[in-house]
Amino acid sequence: GLNFPNNAPGLYIAPFKNDLVVIMNTFKNMNEKIVVEDVPLNKWINVIIRVEDENVDVYINGSIVKRHVLDSVPKQNYDDVYMSMNGGFSGYSSNLWYYDYGLGTTAIQEIVDNGPDLKMIGEDFLGSKPRYFSLRWFFNNTDSNNQSYGGF
């Protein structure tokens, strides 16, 4: 389920689908939704959510896959930042960074180029699955306002 009341931003995996759902609180709309469809499973992916003024850009592995203009100014979340609430997901998180400014494309690419931190507490995690995914995925994400999620 959604965290309440603060989602500025909130990042969720859609139930029963491999879609990412970004939720932003604004002063006009409590939960503006941006859907990134058909995200590859069982692969490391880098997700960057950049908010500047009323514009939200979602990057996957350094490529912008969604651009969304909010209905109004986003609400700033002054509370704690939570990860993997309500049971989380069956996967791993590598790093979480929160900046007080919108990163430029060079900084975004540097983060992607550095890759995930594969060092787990007490052991190394080097998966045997390839770290790439089909370019076809990039061409199938065009609608940022998918309305098909009952709880989202």
Protein language model regions, located:
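Extracellular glycan-associated modules
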Residues: 1-152
